Amino acid sequence: KNYGNGVYCNKHKCSVDWATFSANIANNSVAMAGLTGGNAGNK
């Protein structure tokens, strides 16, 4: 399954397309917040 943010999974593992992932993170801090349990940007 491709999650559309550079992360995609098959039956065995998940992988990250870092170029896509990084571009999405730069444009969408919500994605990073989801991956970090909501801690991104909260200092």
UniProtKB/Swiss-Prot annotation:
Pfam families assigned: Bacteriocin_II
Cellular component terms (Gene Ontology): extracellular region
Keyword Cell inner membrane included in the entry's annotation: no
Disulfide bonds: C9-C14
GO biological process, one term: killing of cells of another organism
pH dependence: Remains active between pH 2 and 10.
Gene3D superfamilies: 1.20.5.130
Thermal response of activity: Remains active after incubation at 121 degrees Celsius for 1 hour.
InterPro entries in the cross-refs: Bacteriocin_IIa, Bacteriocin_IIa_CS, Bacteriocin_IIa_dom_sf
Residue intervals passing through the bilayer: none
Main location: secreted
Origin superkingdom: Bacteria
Subcellular location(s) per record: Secreted
Coiled-coil intervals: none
UniProtKB keywords: Antibiotic, Antimicrobial, Bacteriocin, Disulfide bond, Secreted
Protein purpose: Highly active against Gram-positive bacteria M.flavus strain ATCC 400, M.luteus strain CECT241, C.soprogenes strain NCTC533, L.monocytogenes strain ATCC 19111, L.inocua strain ATCC BAA-680D and S.carnosus strain LMG13564.
Family (UniProt): Belongs to the bacteriocin class IIA/YGNGV family.
Name recorded for this polypeptide: Bacteriocin weissellin-A
Source organism of the structure: Weissella paramesenteroides
